[in-house]
Structures are given as structure tokens and as C-alpha cells.
Amino acid sequence: MERVKMINVQPMLEAAEFLERRERECEHGYASSFPSMPSPRLQHSKPPRRLSRAQKHSSGSSNTSTANRSTHNELEKNRRAHLRLCLERLKVLIPLGPDCTRHTTLGLLNKAKAHIKKLEEAERKSQHQLENLEREQRFLKRRLEQLQGPQEMERIRMDSIGSTISSDRSDSEREEIEVDVESTEFSHGEVDNISTTSISDIDDHSSLQSIGSDEGYSSASVKLSFTS
């Protein structure tokens, strides 16, 4: 029973403490139980302030919208100029017929699409042909290497044989030249004997000098060579 009484009294105590705390706050000025009524001056001054804010907001929004509109117009103008330039370049790149004097944008784009498809098809054919040519080139190169293998070995063998023969021939010719040089070497006494003998023979046979024979010319040349 006492416990039930304590449960019933507890909310009442909490409510009393709450009311007491609110009274103290009102006394110190932290809060008021009733809101204060606004003065007539404030009531009349608030609506004009709200109107001025609305006017400022409306004027600011109008300026912003005007700036946005001008920016949009400028961007649209630039976009149309760029599109016109691209269409002019497209007319130059696409082969157009002589009877086509005026083109619409849609017709020009369709012709460009068809022309691009033709170019892609031609590129595929060219690539396929190039691959076939490269394959044929590799086959011919391997075939040429196979054919040149025995011929190259034969040529190298013949070159080696020819070089050996030429070296032997040059050695024999060098020996013959040395033998000829050794056979033509004379002493000073032999040269003097030959010169005196040839001079006496020429004096004894002076009549032969008048004849324009080969022996006369040879003897004269021998005389000139020894006298010099």
C-alpha cells in the first residue's frame, strides 16, 4: 500500500519541481510563460521590410535570369557557327554530285555515313590484299633461299679454287721474273767486251748501216745504249 502511494506521489513531486524551476527562470528573466505582444510600431514597420526584401529578391532574380539568358544565347550562337563550319568541311570531304546544289543537314549526314561505309569496305579489302602479298613474299623468300643454298656453296667452292690457282700462277710468274733478271745480270768486264766487240763489228760492217734493215736499227740502238 505504501508502495502504491509512493508511485502516485512521485509524478506529483516531479511536476512541482518543474513548476518551481519555471518560476525561478521567469524571475531571473531567462524565460517567460507568456509571449509578449508586439508594439503597433513594429507591426507597421515589418511589412515594408518584407516588401523591400521581396523587391530585392525579385530584382536580383531578374538580373540573374537576364545574365543566364544572354550566356545561353551566346553559347547557342557559337554552337551554330561551329556546326555550320563542320558542315562546310563535310561538303568538301564528301564527293557530291554536280546536280546537288542545295543540301539539307540530314541529307548531308546520310551521304557522309554512306561514304564512310565505302571507305571502311575499301580499307578492309586493301588490308586483306596486303596480307596476301606479305604471305606470298615470305613464301618466295623461303623458296629463293632454298634455291640459292647449293648454288652458293658451289660458288664459294669455285671462288676458293680460283683463288688457289691464281695464287699458284702468281708465284710461278714471280719465279720466272726472278730467273730472267738473274740471267740478264752482267759484270762490268763483260759489258766492256760486248761494247768493244759491237763497235769493231759496226766499223767493219759500215756498209750495212746504210741499209734500213732491222739489224742496222738494232745495232744502232745497241750502240746508243752502250755509249750512253
Swiss-Prot record:
Would I find Kinase among this entry's keywords?
no
Region feature Disordered, mapped onto this chain: 29-76, 162-228
Biological process annotations from GO: blastocyst formation; negative regulation of transcription by RNA polymerase II; regulation of DNA-templated transcription; regulation of transcription by RNA polymerase II
Biased composition regions of type Polar residues, renumbered to the chain: 57-70, 216-228
Boundaries of every bHLH domain copy? 67-119
Q: Where is the signal peptide?
A: none
Main localization of the protein? Answer: nucleus
Q: Which ranges are annotated Acidic residues under compositional bias?
A: 173-183
Q: Which PROSITE patterns match?
A: BHLH
Q: Name one GO cellular component term.
A: RNA polymerase II transcription regulator complex
Designated name of the protein? Max-interacting protein 1
